[in-house]
Design a protein with these regions (language model features):
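Polycationic, low-complexity disordered segments in secreted or periplasmic proteins
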Residues: 143-158
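Signature of dsDNA virion morphogenesis modules
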Residues: 1-140, 157-158
Length: 158
């Protein structure tokens, strides 16, 4: 939800440009650009959701965050992104593809540039290890499955 209404990040084929995350994706803590805690090792869209595998750095600060993720204290995930194309849907109207009812703003072409482990996510349906129940043997020390936000407040965009 943006300050003026619902924001939807479209995950349809061709909507998300993952190039930046694939080439130089970083993992931050709470969107702080000076709090790099890891790197993105793999990113993809599947089932209209974004997914990523990350690797935490080995420094003390990153290790602290990794431990909080592993213990379940930190569960929130968010993405920083840029939008190239918006569809504005007026109250009570349908989006061009008929999937959404207004009022809302739909990012039809957008590019994530960072993934953050966050204390308080804008969208509580997205987070760390949502698929870990299916893969209990996964090694959280080296990589964690993440889902990107569909709805995201981008308070830290500069």
């Amino acid at each position: 939800m943006r300050w003026f209404g619902n924001e939807i990040l479209d995950h349809a084929e061709g909507a998300v440009d993952l190039t930046r995350l694939e080439e130089m994706g970083v993992v931050l803590y709470n969107h702080k650009r000076d709090a790099v805690i890891g790197k993105v090792t793999r990113v993809w869209i599947e089932g209209n959701r974004g997914h990523a595998e990350i690797e935490f750095d080995s420094d003390e600060d990153s290790e602290t965050i990794r431990q909080k993720v592993e213990s379940g204290t930190l569960k929130g995930v968010s993405v920083g992104y840029m939008v190239d194309s918006w569809e504005e849907v007026m109250p009570g109207k349908q989006s061009a593809d008929g999937r959404f009812t207004g009022p809302c703003s739909i990012a039809r072409k957008w590019a994530p540039y960072e993934i953050s482990i966050v204390s308080i996510p804008a969208d509580t349906t997205v987070g760390v290890g949502r698929e870990m129940d299916e893969k209990p043997e996964a090694d959280l020390m080296s990589e964690t499955l993440l889902r990107q936000l569909r709805y995201n407040q981008n308070f830290y965009r500069r």
